[in-house]
Amino acid sequence: EFQLTDQQLKASKEIVTHLAAGYDVLVYAACGAGKTELTMEPLKQALNAGKKVGIAISRRQVVLEIAQRMQRAFKTLKVVPVCQGFTEITEGDLIVCTMHQLYRYHQAFDLLVMDEVDAFPYKGNELLAAVARNSCKGRILYLTATPDSVMLKEVSEGRLKMVELFQRPHGHPLVLPLIKQLPVPLQLVSLLMIMRKQKKPMLIFVPTIDLAQRYGLLFSPLFHCAALTSKTIEKDQIISRLRKRELDFIFTTTILERGITIPGVDVVVLQSDHPVFDEASLIQIIGRVGRSRDCPSGMG
């Protein structure tokens, strides 16, 4: 499950070297490059040495998924997920938790992996950053596709080592976005033309919940589509329907900008100049495209 490509193996060795030299490490890797895979050798070495290891992740669902993957990889160790609904057991060999759950641990971890540090709730949150530092007595490994200026400054000053990986395991080039400058009414006309020709599943990103809901209703008489926002109750069911091709399109917000892989998916961003779509958000959105070996390219 965690077999590495040559590029991943090279990056993984660099991480191990920097950690052993006493540095915190920033892994700057493209969406879909396999950041979890890059952590396996550092995790293995730390766990084999009897050290306490933690992985902090922004979203509860990903905590549960990563905990399962880690338990399969480290069968003889106790891997404990700590998040909403899973707080009765908080101690083990490897702790996988949401960012906020780090408050439970004081100077506990010899190695702490911080995933998606460019995302809510960690991004720009000085309190969570302090909680994370307090939980770790050793080294911190930061994972992101969009490092902020603060981290890059630490790299330039030599206080943080950076390892880069911009190739996905399938070896194909990253998908580059196509940009069209149109007034909003013409954006909808252009979208309609795209939808009529579209043969693959598509995520259509809009800046607000209201627009997602309105466009979902507007286009539903013409296409198999739905809206998915933070207010949607049956999120997993809607995503499953898109994967099964029971739906062709989902109108959504930045809630689906990360943490979701749909083979063959294309993306469109309407009103991409809206403030909600910052650089990091747009990079994550285009990062949904071309992730699988069977469909390494696409439209975004």
Located regions from the model:
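N-terminal pre-P-loop "Q-motif" helix
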Residues: 2-23
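Walker A/P-loop
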Residues: 20-42
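Conserved strand-helix element at the start of the C-terminal RecA-like helicase core
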Residues: 29-36, 46, 51-66, 194-219
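Conserved nucleic-acid-binding Ia/Ib motif block in the N-terminal RecA-like helicase ATPase lobe
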Residues: 48-52, 57-99, 225
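Conserved helicase ATPase core of P-loop NTP-dependent helicases/translocases
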Residues: 80-89, 226-253
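Post-DEXD/H (motif II) to motif III coupling segment of the RecA-like Helicase ATP-binding lobe
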Residues: 107-111, 116-181, 185-186, 190
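Conserved RecA-like helicase motor core of SF1/SF2 enzymes
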Residues: 116-119, 243-248, 254-296
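Conserved segment of the helicase C-terminal RecA-like domain
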Residues: 137-150, 286-300
